[in-house]
Amino acid sequence: MSVKRNKKVSVACVHCAKSHVTCDDNRPCTRCIRKGLEESCIDAPRKKVKYLRDVPEDQLPSVLRSTKQVPPVNAVKLKMEPGILPNIPLDYDGGTIRQSAPANNGKNNPETQQTLSNGQITHRPKFLSSAADLEYSILSDIIHGDSLFNKIPVNFLYSNPTEKTPSPINQGSLNGQQDLHFSLQLRSKPMNQIRGNTRAIYSNLLGPVSHEILQSEFNLYTNHFPLQPQESLDGTLDFKRMTIGTLSPHLTKFDKTINQYYLNFANTFPEIYDSRKIPNLSYALEVEPPEYREIPHDTEIPHTLRFTTPSEIYSLVQTAFPSTTGFHALLRYLKRRFDKNQLVEMCRCLAELRPIFIASTIDLTDEDMIFMEKSHQRTLLEYEKFISQVGTPTCVWRRNGQISYVNDEFSLLTGWNRLELLNKMTFIVELMDGDTVMEYFQTFTRVAYQGFRGAETMRICNLLTPIKGSVIKCCCLWTLKRDAFGLPMMIIGNFMPILTLPEDVGF
């Protein structure tokens, strides 16, 4: 005589799951009816994957939510009364939806599947992702000699990162009101106060044409203008405080004893102008307000940390990062700075990466590239909390060399503050001398796709400062972070200065 066993179900109720017993498809189930637990017999919540644990249930896409949703008790009572339920609209209270979603929300649309299937078959000979395809194309252009000097593609498949994303409400999303609420909160932040005045920051750091660049309508996030060290007569960074409209030292006198300019000219009070005072010997440390030291979270800056919470990252990042724009700008910058022989050596290093890049990205779709950007933003948000507590000068940049984050110690070491590096498209090679740039590409080749031990030290590392001719000799340790597909996502560089003692100092 065989024992009759209950049929297993995919989702058990909360009581059966807690007791680790077999449940059935009925709600309430047979066991809960027998124990008098009919009212609380609902499906047990499924365990979320690791990267979605921080996202609330109501902010997840419909395909990632539980397909079986039980409305609250109040909704069940209203449903029993005729003539009331059809007039109840969708109501958001405390971030939850009172009226349950349709039962077919979790099902796939056959038409969409057919479209996706056709797209995959069509793009099978090339990359499945337009972002990966375009990134590989510019990498090939850098490697080939003819295209290195003559051909630069100008048609991008990316949308402008500064354009506002359409509201999900128009697309019929149940989370449209919440996404709009997040967007309004981000746009209402006084970002100009944190980012400072762009004209004041770059008034004398973009070379002789700084004024023309700042007066034009160029976007500093998508157009690259390299930083240029300036002459400093006294060896200090006081010239960075000279903004547009500052009084000329030839017209008025500056008294160092009181740290002020004279408002009158020399012929007004000549006895005061000619008087010489012994300056008081005093020193002070300049400390910026906390809001100026914080990393600028701005949705309009594509290369740095754009959001402050994980839920904003997962719900509002809807496009892949335009790495191709950065590769184009990097190519133009290298062509202006180095000769042909040096460029050939750099291209030789990049040529070793091309076949491995193809094998790693040939099957990635646009959705995968968007997921990679979400992973980058989420990882950078976590690293920002950790790096801010460590006293080591640290700089984080993407695989195309664009700087994404610097801490206060890096600014103290190099003299480049955070606003100067993050308020525009800035590459890490801009802060290196010629020999260090050559070592940069060789180190990147060693750590990108070859046997990587977790950390790599650059053989040569000399950082440029805002003062022309001033170089800081450092020891640089690389730590490469890969994404879920094995591609280099970000590089964390730790810089420690190499201090040399004067020859006349002995022990």
Swiss-Prot record:
GO terms assigned for molecular function: DNA-binding transcription factor activity, RNA polymerase II-specific; RNA polymerase II transcription regulatory region sequence-specific DNA binding; zinc ion binding
Major localisation: nucleus
Record-annotated DNA-binding residue ranges: 13-41
InterPro entries for this protein: ERT1_acuK_gluconeogen_tf (IPR050335), PAS (IPR000014), PAS-like_dom_sf (IPR035965), PAS_13 (IPR056751), Zn2-C6_fun-type_DNA-bd_sf (IPR036864), Zn2Cys6_DnaBD (IPR001138)
Region span, Disordered: 95-121
Localisation per UniProt entry: Nucleus
Protein name: Transcription activator of gluconeogenesis ERT1
UniProt organism field: Kluyveromyces lactis (strain ATCC 8585 / CBS 2359 / DSM 70799 / NBRC 1267 / NRRL Y-1140 / WM37) (Yeast)
